Amino acid sequence: MYQKIVTGVDGSPNSLRALEHAVQLAKQLSSELIVVYVVHIPITSYSYDVLGSLEVFNKLEEEGKQSLAKCATMASEAGVTARTVLLTGEPAQGILDTAGKEGADLVVVGSRGTGTLERLLMGSVSERVARFSKCPVLVVK
C-alpha cells in the first residue's frame, strides 16, 4: 500500500515520535523510508552581520546532519534502511517538495513543532503539509 514513506524531522520530541511511527510502518510494509530535515532560519534571525549569519547557518546545518545521522541509526536498529535528505528553506515546503519529487505514498510528520508566534502567523508545519500534500499524511501526536 505505502511503498515510499517520507517523514520530516527537526529533532523535537514530536518529530522523533513521528519517525518511530514511520520506521515501524516501513518495516511492516517493506517500504522505502526517506527522512527529511530542513534547515530553517527564521526571518527574525537575519541581520546585517553576514559572518554571524553564516556562523548561525553552519551551526544549524551541522545540527541537521547530526539529527539525520541519529534518525538513520534509529531506523537501522529497527531493521529499516533510511535515506536522508538535508535541505535549506521552509520546512513544510521542503517536506512537500521531497514527497513530490520522490513520489511518496505517505508523509509522516509530528504535530506542533513550531513556536507560538510563528504558528500564529504561518500555521504549523504539520498543518501546511496536511493541507497541501498530494498524498495521505499521518500526523503523530
Question: Where are the regions a protein language model picked out?
Answer:
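Conserved beta-strand positions in the Rossmann-like core of class I SAM-dependent methyltransferases
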Residues: 34, 83, 138
